[in-house]
């Protein structure tokens, strides 16, 4: 209980650092940026969220790590706030929905051709918690944990590279 309370307190204080790897359709307008847009429930859909005027303040930072010529990007994403579905909602709002996300897909007509080419490569949203840093609840030592991309996301990365190279020819 004590350790859990200490880590929960760090999360509330915003002293836990989390980074995610995301593969998105399209390309953000800038190599680095942030989405500062309030998130709340999507009217008529109790489990979904959206950028809404009366939503909770929400801030997501992103950096493009790879641009694929086939119409996708790999991003490093971090959260200044922790809203439900925040990355998914903010990426859709930015016009770059997560690959494989059935709920926050954006304009299907825009991304349908690439989505068809990626069918069967990944069967979930292409989002992975890759880095976590916090203070050990007992010793106070800074802990940094990293997690490599899972197999399905590495497969996606290879396929995006292959599709991009085939378009360059």
Residue ranges and their predicted role:
Residues 1-169:
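RNA pseudouridine synthases
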